[in-house]
């Protein structure tokens, strides 16, 4: 009898726990969350919007949309992925009005920078170019969307595949961009997700190729790691999980 009473009591306790642990409690019903960036965010997403199995891609953004959507269905939040493979800040800027500002998201997540390295950018842009362009983009965004919460993701790299041979040299340039993201976060009072530190620490638990299959694109385990850290940082900044 006592076991049965405990089981019945649990039915009333569990929903209360679920409500207390609701992710992103600062968001309201029908709010929109937009993910912007390059191929890491793109995740091979389907473009037309007719295939809802693949509309978010296969990445950290998908994991977050799945978890938050399942844990908080009552709010009917909308998740939109606008990441495009191969893009850097100049390409984001060209489509920013259509793919970001016009959407008026409640929460905007940006991860860009790996394609802004001299070895990747066709224009061979410098760190100063990256800072000026990214800073201008954020200034325009903050002015146009004063109520939108913005989180910045730090670009990252691991010594895997073709990035292994020149890893030290590439990291010199990448670190400049990582420091720029930190400065821009401080300037506009935006939280920054330090993915490089996250992956460096994870490499003490498993080899780098467990987390990234080519040095810049995460494996499913890497995307899972990113999603957990994203949620931790965002909830720490604006709410509690």
Where are these regions (language model features)?
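Bacterial N-terminal signal peptides that target proteins for export
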Residues: 1-9
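Alpha-helical cap/lid subdomain in secreted, periplasmic
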Residues: 3, 27, 59, 63-78, ...
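Intrinsic low-complexity/disordered segments
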Residues: 18-19, 33, 220
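Short glycine-rich His-centered loop
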Residues: 23-54
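Conserved active-site regions of diverse hydrolases
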Residues: 84
């Amino acid at each position: 009898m006592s076991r049965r009473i405990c089981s019945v009591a649990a039915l009333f306790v569990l929903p209360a726990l679920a409500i207390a642990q609701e992710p992103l409690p600062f968001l309201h019903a029908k709010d929109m969350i937009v993910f912007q960036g390059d191929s890491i965010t793109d995740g091979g997403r389907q473009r037309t919007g007719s295939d809802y199995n693949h509309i978010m891609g296969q990445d950290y953004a998908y994991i977050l949309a799945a978890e938050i959507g399942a844990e908080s269905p009552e709010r009917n939040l909308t998740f939109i992925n606008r990441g495009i493979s191969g893009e850097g800040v100049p390409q984001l800027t060209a489509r920013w009005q259509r793919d970001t500002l016009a959407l008026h998201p409640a929460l905007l997540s940006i991860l860009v920078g790996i394609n802004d390295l001299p070895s990747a950018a066709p224009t061979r842009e410098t760190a100063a170019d990256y800072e000026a362009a990214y800073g201008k983009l954020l200034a325009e965004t903050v002015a146009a969307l004063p109520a939108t919460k913005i989180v910045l993701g730090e670009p990252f790299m691991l010594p895997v595949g073709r990035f292994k041979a020149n890893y030290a040299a590439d990291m010199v340039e990448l670190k400049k961009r990582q420091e720029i993201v930190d400065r821009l976060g401080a300037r506009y009072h935006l939280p920054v997700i330090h993915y490089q530190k996250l992956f460096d620490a994870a490499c003490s638990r498993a080899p780098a190729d467990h987390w990234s299959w080519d040095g810049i694109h995460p494996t499913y385990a890497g995307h899972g790691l990113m999603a957990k850290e994203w949620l931790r940082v965002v909830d720490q900044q604006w709410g509690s999980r």
